[in-house]
Amino acid sequence: MTRPLLPPPTAADMEQMAASSIRSLPEHFRRELADVVIKIEEFATREQLDSVDIASRWDLTGLYEGRPIDEQSQWDSGDLPPIISLFRQPLIREWRETGVDFGALIHHVTIHEAGHHFGLSDDDMHALEDAADNI
C-alpha cells in the first residue's frame, strides 16, 4: 500500500511522538531511560550505517548508541549520554510504502531501540515482538 503524498511529520512531531512512547512505559523503565537522548536526523551517517552493517541509508530507521545499562558502572565518567536516533526520511518512506500508522511506527522503533539500552539484542527484540503479536 502506498500512501498519497501527505505532508510528512516534522522532526519536532517525531520527537514528541518518541517522547510520548517513552512516557507510556512503566515507571521503572522510564527511570532507566531518563538520561537517554532522543535525536531525529534525516538519515544515518555512514559511520552509523557501518556500525550495524547496513549499506543503504534508506534501510536504517533507528539506532541506539551507548552502553546498555547492564554494562554501565557507577565509576564510569566522561561518557556521552546514550542516544536513540530516529531517521526521518527512512521512516517516512516506510510509512508511505506500508500504510502503517505513523505514530505506531515511531512507537515501535523507539521501543525497539530502548530495548537495546536494557541489553536486548535485535534477535531478543524480534522474539519479544513475535511473542507479543501472538497474544
Model-derived segments and their meaning:
Residues 131:
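Extracytoplasmic/periplasmic copper-protein system
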Residues 109, 113-117:
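Catalytic glutamate of the conserved HExxH
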Residues 1-105, 117, 121-124, 134-135:
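Active-site rim/adjacent substrate-binding subdomains
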